[in-house]
Amino acid sequence: MDGYNTSENSSCDPILAHHLTSIYFIVLIGGLVGLISILFLLVKMNSRSVTTMAVINLVVVHGVFLLTVPFRLAYLIKGTWTFGLPFCKFVSAMLHIHMYLTFLFYVVILVIRYLIFFKRRDKVEFYRKLHAVAASSAMWLLVIVIVVPLVVSQYGNSEEYNEQQCFRFHKELGHDSVRVINYMIVIVVIAVALILLGFQVFITLSMVRKFRHSLLSHQEFWAQLKNLFFIGIIIICFLPYQFFRIYYLYVVAHSKSCKNKVAFYNEILLSTTAISCCDLLLFVFGGSHWVKQKIVDMWNCLLCH
């Protein structure tokens, strides 16, 4: 992928294929199961809820991205890209678009839940279902009008690339303007993630102090527990890549040779961001009665000791 060196020496390639193939198979299977599972749950959810709209948009983002995963797997298995360079750019860009749109919807969901907690409200929702549809449509129109043309016109267009070798656009990072934009994105994502984590720690500790031993009997706690799923995915899937991205940008800017280990770690961490596709499966699984009962049993067991 995106971190491959474009020189004739392909020594960066073999060490990546096996690891990435396994990861993307997990992403494809887990993502599809999660999409199917959440569809049954969405039928019962309030269609005017802001959180529900964010979840529906997550379904769309994951669904579009999962359509590109089989092409990545085909390239990893065959070792040759046969779908044309323009489509390669689209598939490559979709991994990044998916990551940042998913992060955006996580932020929306968490901010709404935090507002509910601090303002002591039962829910935050649109006045009409039409308003919810209009808000989502406006967001997607913005993505289609701004993001897609930007990707088509700028992504991977500054250098020459081999049409049979895909996801090797790291030379674009040699341009100062591209690196500056990347640094800015990294800083914003890390800062927002840490702020959300701080709020979640504060809320969780407040609830523990308030309810103590009766913590698990309050619905408010279970609502906040779902927040931990999203926070956990941000910490596990997104932040490692963002932190390593800072070092990777520096290496690409100051080195002309292939850095095996740097390219390897960048690709592995980038591919782990796609594991966020399994979030819907965790969301459904975490809301099941069986899981709640197991958590209650474990909590009671800890109190006994």
Swiss-Prot record:
GO biological process, one term: inflammatory response
Protein name: Probable G-protein coupled receptor 141
Origin superkingdom: Eukaryota
Lineage: Eukaryota, Metazoa, Chordata, Craniata, Vertebrata
Membrane topology, Cytoplasmic segments: 44-50, 113-131, 206-227, 289-305
Alphabetized PROSITE patterns for the sequence: G_PROTEIN_RECEP_F1_2 (PS50262)
Keywords: Cell membrane, G-protein coupled receptor, Glycoprotein, Membrane, Receptor, Transducer, Transmembrane, Transmembrane helix
Membrane topology: Multi-pass membrane protein
Family named by the database record: Belongs to the G-protein coupled receptor 1 family.
Annotated glycan sites: 5, 9
Main location (coarse class): membrane
Coiled-coil intervals: none
Protein's cellular compartments: Cell membrane
Example GO molecular function: oxysterol binding
Database matches in PANTHER family: G-PROTEIN COUPLED RECEPTOR (PTHR24237), G-PROTEIN COUPLED RECEPTOR 141-RELATED (PTHR24237:SF35)
InterPro entries referenced in this protein's UniProt entry, alphabetically: GP183-like (IPR047160), GPCR_Rhodpsn (IPR000276), GPCR_Rhodpsn_7TM (IPR017452)
